[in-house]
Regions:
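Residue-level detector of beta-propeller blades
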Residues: 31, 35-37, 330
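Surface-exposed amphipathic alpha-helical segments
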Residues: 303-343
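Cleaved targeting-peptide boundary
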Residues: 22-31
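Intrinsically disordered, low-complexity regulatory segments enriched in Ser/Thr/Pro
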Residues: 121-134, 138-140, 284-313
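Bacterial Sec-dependent N-terminal signal peptides
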Residues: 1-22
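Functionally constrained cores in energy, signaling, and assembly domains
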Residues: 11, 15, 158, 185, ...
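Short, solvent-exposed recognition patches
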Residues: 36-283
């Protein structure tokens, strides 16, 4: 009975997968489409009203300069701006520019009528966001009014900001254009990332030493000693730091350690390097509505992977088509304009 049930379940799952699979005949790849842009930032503050105009200009630059966005075919292109801000992000002095996401929805036309509007294929990139373009930032808790001492609110938040401001950086591959750096997640993986920046400014990311990380870990854990577990973690941290040599403490920090589990870093160049965003990168003589850095997901599937994607989905991998049509040199040069005014 169990074997029969398992067989029936497998047949049902296979049928569902086949039913959900898409084929090219489901779409109208040659039907002309249209471009639209909308702003999802709802704040009525003056800086956001000004910023919305800057981002609209940027969106229009993409519309005018990327062929598949200028003359959509097989889909309507719905571009949307999404804001992203929170009080802890703004507390960090390395975060100056207002951050935003610009999303492109490829609303494919169905051969049976209508178009794909709910979670269609899409691509997005980030503007002025220091938490993108690299590995994920940590998520150490900030002050909790239900658990923490009110007198420690400022100290706890400052310690958490420092802890959460350190991130692992993917391997640098090359500079594809002045002001455009390419990183890859792994040597055998297609996900890549681009950072578009002003090369006349100081480095956007700066390394941290093992000692710096040891100090900010101590600052954080010494503020959290209410429970026995908190005290055990602090004691373990102090033990781990004592086991590090002076040479390793002064070395650049890399992610991972064979034995330590609180201060999980090493100075032996093993793993991804740890860095933080450089506060000096920002040109603070400009308003915080200016565009000073952008980060892009940059997929580069090989032909076999692209063919498999097309077979499984019935449509091209639009993200890769899009990034391969962007004029990266021109985009980097326009970075110096900051407001992307359209001439």
């Amino acid at each position: 009975m169990t074997k029969l049930f398992t067989f029936i379940l497998l047949v049902i799952l296979l049928h569902c997968n086949l039913a959900n699979a898409q084929s090219p005949s489901d779409y109208l790849p040659d039907k002309p489409g249209k471009w639209s842009y909308s702003n999802n930032i709802t704040s009525a503050e003056a800086e956001y009203i000004s910023y919305s105009k800057v981002i609209a200009s940027l969106a229009e630059w993409f519309h005018l300069n990327v062929p598949m966005l200028n003359s959509p075919k097989g889909f309507d292109l719905a571009a949307t701006t999404y804001g992203g801000w929170d009080k802890y992000y703004r507390m960090n002095d390395c975060n100056y520019g207002l951050r935003t996401e610009l999303n492109f929805d490829f609303q494919l036309f169905f051969s049976g009528g209508g178009k794909w509007t709910i979670e269609p294929p899409h691509y997005s990139f980030d503007i002025n966001n220091t938490e993108t373009g690299h590995g994920t930032n940590p998520n150490y808790p900030y002050f909790d009014e239900l658990q923490d001492d009110p007198g420690l609110e400022k100290a706890i938040n400052e310690a958490s900001i420092k802890m959460n401001g350190v991130f692992a950086v993917y391997d640098f591959v090359k500079q594809i254009e002045p002001g455009v750096d390419l990183y890859r997640e792994a040597a055998d993986a297609f996900p890549h990332h681009l950072v578009v920046y002003n090369p006349e400014r100081p480095a956007y990311w700066i390394p941290v030493t093992v000692r710096e990380l040891a100090e900010i870990h101590l600052q954080y854990y010494k503020l959290r000693t209410k429970t026995e577990m908190d005290r055990m973690l602090l004691a373990q941290l102090e033990k781990e730091i004592s086991e590090l040599s002076e040479d390793e403490l002064t070395a650049p920090a890399f992610l991972g350690h064979d034995e330590h589990f609180v201060l999980k870093v090493n100075g032996k160049k093993e793993g991804l390097q740890l860095m933080r965003f450089n506060p000096e990168y920002w040109d603070r003589s400009l308003p915080n509505t200016s565009i000073q850095i952008m980060t892009f997901y940059y997929p580069q599937m090989d032909e076999a992977a692209l063919a498999e994607s097309y077979k499984n989905n019935g449509h091209p991998f639009y993200s890769q088509l899009l990034v391969n049509e962007i004029g990266w040199r021109k985009l980097a040069e326009l970075m110096k304009m900051h407001d992307f005014g359209i001439n």
